[in-house]
């Protein structure tokens, strides 16, 4: 087979070669179904993580927790002083009833 007879067959060979190339490359391209599944997953993740607090929110929460911790310490000291005063009052009441 000489070159001229091969060139005469080019209209028939070109679609076969192009089809073979597309068939060989089909794995390198994502299917529409796969892309849609990935888009759905991405949308679901974006929706789920949209409500997660950011760094500023976490920082603000830490500050508020520190404030609450200080308030709790103050309240604890006040409760202890009230408890001590109640003990003294009860002791005084018991001593009066014994006399």
UniProtKB/Swiss-Prot annotation:
Keywords: Cytolysis, Host cell inner membrane, Host cell lysis by virus, Host cell membrane, Host membrane, Late protein, Membrane, Transmembrane, Transmembrane helix, Viral release from host cell. It is found in: Host cell inner membrane. The chain crosses the membrane at residues 3-23. It comes from the Viruses. Its main location: host cell. One of its GO terms (biological process) is viral release from host cell by cytolysis. The keyword Transmembrane helix applies. It is a single-pass type I membrane protein. Induction: Expressed in the late phase of the viral replicative cycle. Expression of late genes is activated by the viral late transcription activator C. One of its GO terms (cellular component) is host cell plasma membrane. InterPro entries: Phage_Mu_Releasin. Facilitates the release of the SAR-endolysin. This is Releasin protein.
């Amino acid at each position: 087979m000489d070159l001229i007879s091969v060139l005469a067959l080019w209209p028939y060979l070109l679609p076969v070669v192009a089809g073979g190339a597309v068939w060989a490359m089909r794995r390198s391209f994502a299917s529409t179904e796969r892309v849609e599944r990935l888009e759905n997953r991405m949308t679901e993740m974006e929706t789920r993580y949209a409500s997660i607090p950011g760094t500023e929110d976490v920082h603000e929460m830490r500050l508020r927790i520190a404030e609450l911790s200080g308030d709790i310490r103050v309240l604890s000291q006040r409760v202890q002083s009230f408890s001590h005063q109640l003990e003294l009052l009860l002791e005084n009441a018991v001593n009066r009833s014994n006399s």
